């Protein structure tokens, strides 16, 4: 199933909730009020994208004719073991990594690529080539299990002093921590304190 943006997910979930509770879909105005969009044209744009991605079907001759067509797709996805994992676009200090404000979109992922509870998993897009010797390339999606501790040698996602997420290999040394790139041309990062956001448990690469 094609991934949805955060806003598209909000609209889709609202439509589905209304259809399932009331038996009929909400109006464009109601959708806009529910998700904080004042412009009806913006709502129509999101509905068009949801339709093109196969989540809904609309009848242009009827104002409220929004049919949820992805329920069956979701059932099929569950049978095939597919989960929708949050993709983290930024990391905010003092806020849980999977907080709504950090999530850019949701990405459909085969369940066999994870080895833990779905709620503990998030995805981070890799930027740069600091981990290429570990087989992690620029543009890859690393699958991360949320946790705050790490063992020496673990590949982790850590928060830097600039409040940015970085993927490095973790080592605890005497009186300091070392975040080691897997790139022989790069120097390690030494920190007195480090915030571990999660451990990399898998990798997804789009060909």
UniProtKB/Swiss-Prot annotation:
Family indicated by similarity: Belongs to the peptidase S24 family.
Matching InterPro entries: ArsR-like_HTH (IPR011991), LexA (IPR006200), LexA-like (IPR039418), LexA/Signal_pep-like_sf (IPR036286), LexA_DNA-bd_dom (IPR006199), LexA_repressor (IPR050077), Peptidase_S24_LexA (IPR006197), Peptidase_S24_S26A/B/C (IPR015927)
EC number: 3.4.21.88
Protein name: LexA repressor
One annotated GO molecular function: DNA binding
Keywords: Autocatalytic cleavage, DNA damage, DNA repair, DNA replication, DNA-binding, Hydrolase, Repressor, SOS response, Transcription, Transcription regulation
Site feature location: Cleavage: 93-94
């Amino acid at each position: 199933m094609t991934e949805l943006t955060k806003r598209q997910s909000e609209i889709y979930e609202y439509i589905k909730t209304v259809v399932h509770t009331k038996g009929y879909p909400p109006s464009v105005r109601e959708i806009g009020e529910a998700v904080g969009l004042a412009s009806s044209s913006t709502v129509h744009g999101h509905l068009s994208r949801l339709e093109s991605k196969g989540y809904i079907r609309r009848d242009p001759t009827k104002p409220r004719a929004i049919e949820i067509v992805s329920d069956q797709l979701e059932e099929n996805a569950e049978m095939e073991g597919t989960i929708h994992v949050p993709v983290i676009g930024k990391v905010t200090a003092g806020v849980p990594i999977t907080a709504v404000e950090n999530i850019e979109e949701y990405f459909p992922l085969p369940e066999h690529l994870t080895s833990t509870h779905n709620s503990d998993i998030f995805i981070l897009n890799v930027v740069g080539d600091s981990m290429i010797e570990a087989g992690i390339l620029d543009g890859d999606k690393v699958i991360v299990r949320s946790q705050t501790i790490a063992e020496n040698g673990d590949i982790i996602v850590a928060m830097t002093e600039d409040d940015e997420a970085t993927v490095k290999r973790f080592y605890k040394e005497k009186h300091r921590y070392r975040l080691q790139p897997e790139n022989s041309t790069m120097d390690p990062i030494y920190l007195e304190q480090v915030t571990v956001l999660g451990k990399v448990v898998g990798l997804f690469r789009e060909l």
